[in-house]
């Protein structure tokens, strides 16, 4: 199925609910005469614990939990741990942490797919006894060769085995008496079906492998298409909401629940298009490769699309939930622009982030007519959009730091910052200054900018109503500022479609996805903020303090590496919004 590129607009958010076809189906089901009339809407989120949740999972999370919330219903969290190869309790814990961080809760409805292994086995035996399943001895190669084609039925010489023989062989499989790959249990449906998922699919296979919860108790494991509908039915799920690739599996889902004697109602499976974002890969296999081959620092690298990576970068739960609401629910696969996600974060942080000043590429500014040793205190607002966030104090002295590009000895046209004998400029929250010159080293590099201040312009207001044409500049006091490391993140992939056909996604990596700046200057209160964050018990599971560095962007303390003695900030998102409105 082809994917369309999709740019959402603010108007999309307003109509997203009207486009949610899932809600329309549920409304029909719970209405008078519907199959779930009078019942509580009950959904589930069933992640496989073989990796960390990423932004692609968030759409399903918001749909599963959000739908239940909308109808005052229930949503289960079920670990789909029926494939033991790469499952681990590390991922189980991380998944629970990420879901709670997003603001969802499953109450006492936490389950494992492996909780149902005994029931899965019983229902498999029931199918055999009904003549609806058989043990097949085709090797994987033979299975593939005998699968048939469009208009050509599949073949299995074992399809008509007697029921008693199938029961005996399946018991041997369960008892570990059959080598791995020698036998499978297949559902007996229709070898000529146009839907290849219905051509007697494998529902059990042999794996001699340790399970993260069951150990070596089981050596046969149910396939997802068999276990999933049974688990849904046993948990009382009304609506099994899943991504679009399972649409062709729905006939098998329905076949399973209709042919085993589960004494509950039959769930309804509904599919929706999964989330794809440009400049990103969502495949767990590819993400694992990035981690294991050290293209990134770990699963929580801020360039990764994992929730722990996004959280470390400064993404908030509210911004991610707003993003999922904005893009809506549809049946057509599409690729969302990364700028849409950034827009949602920028909107959230604009309202919540405290403003502070930080200089990333510092050059010294000396106010030559300001007394040596003198210091003043100024009060600056924490957030101009929300006066209730209050103010904080900054100090001003003769020696300051400003951004290197806020001075130009030979200015380009329309340059409105500091230049010798140029325009007067405001130092944010303090005084008006005018550049008088600069100091250079032996190589001709500017090491110090010289200026004079207007003593009558305290707070940045010119005396006698004088109009100031220069820019307002951010700065920090060189006498008490803190040094910091600042990490500037960009897209991990320079190619918008690293998952595209005939591409090696590793060839699409962006060599400029991380720039590390040292010797940056930040306000002294940042040490206090970092010291408070150091006291947090679960630093990586929560958002670190986030700020708007005035004129620069939104930044957060790194929730893993930053300390009160070594400040590390991650750029969450730039100030400039590339989102198409």
PLM region spans:
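N-terminal catalytic cores of NTP/NDP-binding nucleotidyl/phosphoryl-transfer enzymes
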Residues: 15-26, 31-96, 211-243
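Conserved short loop/turn motifs at secondary-structure junctions
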Residues: 46-49, 78-86, 108-118, 141, ...
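Secondary-structure transition/capping motifs at alpha-helix termini
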Residues: 32-37, 66-74, 100-107, 130, ...
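Long, charged, mostly alpha-helical binding arms that flank functional sites
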Residues: 265-344
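Active-site cores that bind ATP or allylic diphosphates and position pyrophosphate for catalysis
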Residues: 77, 81-83, 89, 126-287, ...
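N-terminal acidic, proline/glycine-rich, low-complexity intrinsically disordered segments
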Residues: 1-9
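A glycine-rich helix N-cap at a beta->alpha junction
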Residues: 91-117, 123-124, 131-134
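Core subunits and conserved enzymes of cellular information-processing
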Residues: 246-250, 254-256, 321, 325-328, ...
């Amino acid at each position: 199925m082809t994917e369309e590129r999709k740019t959402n607009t603010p108007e999309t958010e307003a109509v997203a609910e009207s486009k949610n076809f899932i809600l329309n189906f549920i409304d029909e089901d719970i209405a008078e005469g519907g199959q779930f009339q009078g019942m509580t809407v009950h959904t589930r989120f069933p992640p496989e614990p073989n990796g960390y949740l990423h932004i692609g999972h968030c759409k399903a999370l918001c749909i599963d939990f959000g739908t239940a919330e909308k109808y005052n219903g229930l949503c289960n969290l079920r670990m789909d741990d029926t494939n033991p190869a790469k499952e681990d309790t590390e991922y189980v814990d991380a998944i629970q942490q990420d879901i709670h961080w997003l603001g969802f809760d499953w109450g006492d409805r936490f389950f494992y797919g492996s909780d149902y292994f005994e029931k899965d086995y019983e229902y498999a035996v029931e199918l055999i006894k009904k003549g609806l399943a058989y043990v097949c001895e085709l090797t994987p190669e033979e299975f593939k060769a005998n699968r048939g084609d469009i208009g050509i039925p599949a073949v299995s010489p074992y399809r008509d085995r007697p029921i008693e023989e199938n029961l005996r062989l399946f018991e041997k499989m369960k008892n570990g008496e059959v080598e791995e790959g020698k036998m499978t249990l297949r559902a007996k449906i229709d070898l000529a079906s146009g839907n290849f998922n219905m051509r007697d699919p494998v529902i059990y296979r042999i794996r001699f492998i340790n399970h993260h919860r069951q150990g070596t108790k089981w050596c046969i494991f149910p396939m997802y298409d068999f276990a999933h509908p049974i688990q849904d039915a046993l948990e009382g799920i009304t609506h099994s909401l899943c991504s679009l690739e399972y649409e062709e599996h729905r006939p098998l889902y329905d076949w399973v629940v209709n042919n085993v004697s589960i004494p509950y109602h039959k769930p309804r499976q509904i599919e929706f298009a999964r989330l794809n974002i440009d400049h990103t890969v969502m495949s767990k296999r590819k993400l694992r490769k990035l981690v294991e081959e050290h293209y990134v620092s770990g699963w929580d690298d801020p360039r990764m699309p994992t929730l722990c990576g996004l959280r470390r970068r400064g993404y908030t739960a509210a911004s991610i939930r707003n993003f999922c609401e904005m893009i809506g629910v549809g049946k057509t696969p599409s690729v969302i622009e990364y700028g849409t996600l950034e827009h949602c974060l920028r909107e959230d942080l604009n309202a919540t982030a405290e403003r502070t000043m930080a200089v990333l590429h510092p050059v010294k500014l000396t106010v030559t007519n300001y007394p040596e040793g003198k210091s003043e205190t100024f009060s600056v607002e924490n957030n101009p959009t929300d006066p209730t966030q209050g103010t904080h104090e900054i100090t001003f002295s003769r020696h300051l730091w400003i951004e290197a590009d806020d001075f130009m000895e030979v200015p380009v046209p329309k340059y409105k910052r500091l230049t010798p004998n140029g325009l007067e400029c405001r130092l944010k929250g303090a005084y008006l200054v005018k550049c008088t010159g600069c100091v250079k080293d032996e190589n001709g590099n500017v090491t110090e900018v010289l200026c004079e201040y207007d003593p009558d312009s305290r707070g940045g207001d010119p005396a006698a109503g004088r109009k100031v044409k220069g820019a307002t500049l951010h700065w920090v006091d060189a006498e008490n500022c803190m040094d910091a490391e600042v990490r500037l993140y960009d897209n991990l992939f320079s190619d918008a479609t690293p998952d595209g056909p005939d591409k090696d996604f590793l060839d699409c990596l962006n060599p400029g996805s991380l720039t590390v700046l040292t010797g940056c200057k930040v306000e002294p209160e940042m040490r206090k903020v970092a010291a408070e964050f150091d006291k947090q018990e679960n630093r990586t599971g929560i958002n670190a303090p986030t700020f708007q560095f005035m004129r620069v962007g939104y930044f957060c303390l790194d929730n893993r590496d930053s300390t009160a003695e070594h400040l590390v900030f991650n750029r969450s998102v730039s100030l400039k919004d590339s989102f198409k409105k």
